[in-house]
Structures are given as C-alpha cells and as structure tokens.
C-alpha cells in the first residue's frame, strides 16, 4: 500500500510516465515453526505491477497511508531474521514473529474500514460504488469483517489469503496479477 502511494505521487507529478513496483517478502525466514499460532498464517511471495499515466478517470483515484507506531507490540519480529538460541543451545521460544491476534484483529478491522471510507470520500464515492476491492491479504477474517462493515459483502472483494497466507508486501501485487 505504501509503495502504491509513493508511485501514485510520482505519476501525478508528471515527471514519470511508467513505474515498476515490486513487493516481495520471505516471511518463512521470520516465523518460529514451533509456534503454531503464527507460522501457519504467513507465506513467502513476490509480485510486481507496472503503473502508468493514462487519460480518463481510471486507475488509482486516491491513496491514504496511516500508521500507529505505538501499536508495534501487536505484531513484531522480536529478534530479526535469525534464529536465536539459549545458553543450552535450544531454540529461543520467543524467536520470530510475535503477534497478539485478537487485539490486532480489532485494530486492523477498524483501521482498514476507516481508511477505506476516507479514501472513498476523498474521491466523492461511497462503498456501494466499489466494483472490486483488492485489500492487503492479511487475514481472511479481517477481510470479511471489513467487507461487512462497508456493506459490500465478499462478492466485491478479491481474496487469496487462504491459498498463500499473508505475504506482506507481495500480497496486493499477487492479488492484482490473479
């Protein structure tokens, strides 16, 4: 999403006509395979999309990027990309992606619903105007809850998270390719 926002700004400036955006993550290097609450949720992936200026009212109409660094404890990687071991040589049980799922779910649903409404308002559109929503593929339950909050239902939402898991920066390019 952040990459799309940056590319959108470059294209609107008129200095660029065509830009390749690549999103790739190897989350399998960051999961603790002994932690079944997180390791099954994430996947590796890469995707790319070429965006270009075109006349008319098609394409990316608006972007809104928000973040809240104070919520970092809801989802973070405690020790980086390398496994850590205790003094006995055992794998550190706190290694890898750490997530507070129920809390993260509530925050994500509220934030994605609100930012989607803001983006639509910025363009003078309503949720009913959405023909197809391609959200970040974080979690099926989050995507379903956001679709419900927007009143669009899943028939207007593209979803592939059940096949690939959360591929982080690659999720939207992969979904757009499909």
Residue map of PLM features:
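Beta-strand segments within the central parallel beta-sheet cores of soluble alpha/beta enzyme folds
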Residues: 16-24, 61-63, 128-134, 155-160
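A polyampholytic, Gly/Pro-enriched intrinsically disordered region
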Residues: 8-19, 82-87, 177-178
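Flexible, glycine-rich active-site loops centered on histidine and acidic residues
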Residues: 10-46
């Amino acid at each position: 999403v952040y990459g799309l926002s940056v590319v959108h700004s470059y294209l609107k400036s008129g200095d660029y006509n065509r830009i390749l955006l690549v999103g790739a993550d190897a989350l399998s290097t960051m999961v603790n395979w002994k932690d079944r609450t997180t390791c099954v949720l994430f996947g590796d992936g890469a995707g790319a999309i070429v965006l270009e200026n075109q006349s008319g009212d098609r394409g990316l109409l608006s972007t809104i990027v928000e973040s809240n660094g104070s919520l970092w404890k809801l989802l973070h990687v405690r020790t980086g990309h390398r496994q850590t071991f205790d003094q006995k040589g055992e794998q550190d049980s706190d290694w890898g992606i750490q997530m507070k799922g129920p809390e993260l779910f509530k925050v994500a649903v509220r934030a994605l619903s609100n930012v989607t409404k803001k983006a639509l308002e910025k363009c003078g559109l309503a949720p009913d105007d959405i023909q197809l929503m391609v959200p970040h593929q974080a979690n099926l339950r989050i995507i379903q809850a956001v679709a419900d909050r927007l009143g669009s239902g899943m028939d207007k939402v593209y979803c592939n998270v059940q096949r690939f898991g959360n591929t982080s920066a690659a999720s939207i390019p992969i979904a757009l390719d499909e």
